[in-house]
Amino acid sequence: MALELLLAMPLVAEVRSLTILHTNDLHARVTALDDGRGGFAALAAVIRKQRAQCSDCVLLNAGDLVQGSPISTVFHGLPVFEIANLFGFDAATLGNHDFDYGWIEARKFIDTANYPIVSGNLVGAGGRLFTPKPYVILRVNGLRVAVIGAMTEELRTLSTPKLMEEWHAVSVIEAARKYAAALHDRTDLVVLLGHINEVEEDRFLSQATEIPVLVTGHIHGGLEHEVSRNGRVLVRVRGYGEELGRLELAVDTEKKAPVSWTWKRLPVDGREIEPAGDVAVQVNRWEDEVSKQVDQPVAVSLRHFESSEIKRLIEQAMRDETGADFAFINQGGVRDVLPKGQLLVRHIWNIMPFDNRVVFGKFKGRDLPPVVLGDQKVDPEREYTLAVSDFTAANQSADEQLRSSGLRFSGDGGLLRDVLVDWFRKKKVIE
């Protein structure tokens, strides 16, 4: 009887410390950016320095580990996961770009990772989960910390349908709240590790009172300061490995929530910290595999180009190289900036890492949406050729005007990044 009474009694409330180190949207940027920031070897060094300073650390990644560098493009992402195993992640979730090579490759990523990859709302037929588990329970500093993975509900519109097949994301907040409720008596804290958009972030902060900590990715710009609401906190750092987040929590085990926290964004710069040698060896090994293919000069840029300007350059290249009257690419398809100076094939691949192909459609002027026309005037009855990527043609999700227009495309104008390389080589100078 005494034992039964003891087991029935609530545990004495304690406040214990927990430090969450976190990354998101690394996008295969294994080498440093042109300004010296980032790079997997420097990021690993920052992570290891931080872990050496605390005994209550966990390391999380909020998705989109691949897609964004030649190593990822050529080898379909697998080497990136192999290198990332050296970071020492305790848990991760998948991002939409982790499916850019198809769901079968994404499964290989899960098998390759030496840490659990979780998602609670990524499902197929009959609701079966894509990942082995929807969550993982980490034990650190006497705390039982549940980490629930989550994918943005926009997944289908952000991916090529044929690469996803049956897999899709169901309501992110309903799935996460379901698992949080089931975990309530088994854990001291629930953390959402989500690759979600800003609307979904806001919905969690407003509605999901049972999930007090959110570590997110998908929006590359990161946050200047943590977002807090009613005792809950959300954090997200800049992508491409430019920053490591450090969230220090004081967790009340009875309330199952933090009573205080501090958050820091730690810069990653190989000029200020000695890069991790073992990671550098692996990065260099794979870089040597692709260097001959991508470290070839294509043109000279007389100034720095931002992504909005590059969108216009890409559309011009598509028109010039294919003879189309109009071209359109969604802004989200531009993945990098162009620096001033010598441009290499690598730079072109970085702005367009996808295996997207150019396709065409012939349409009357009256059927072309304003997003394609801009300020150009057309004859409503004349037929015009419009070039787009096959990604845009497949779901036309990049723009509401295209989606509502119902335009249909066909043909094959080649890989878009090859079209761009040819165009830059012919231009020689970009200004």
Segments predicted by a language model, with ranges:
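Extreme N-terminus of proteins, especially the signal/transit-peptide cleavage junction
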Residues: L11-R16, V290, V294
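Acidic, metal/ion-coordinating pockets
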Residues: V12-D278, S307-A317, E321, A327-I329, ...
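Solvent-exposed loop/linker segments at secondary-structure transitions
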Residues: N24-R29, Q67-P70, E200-S206, V213, ...
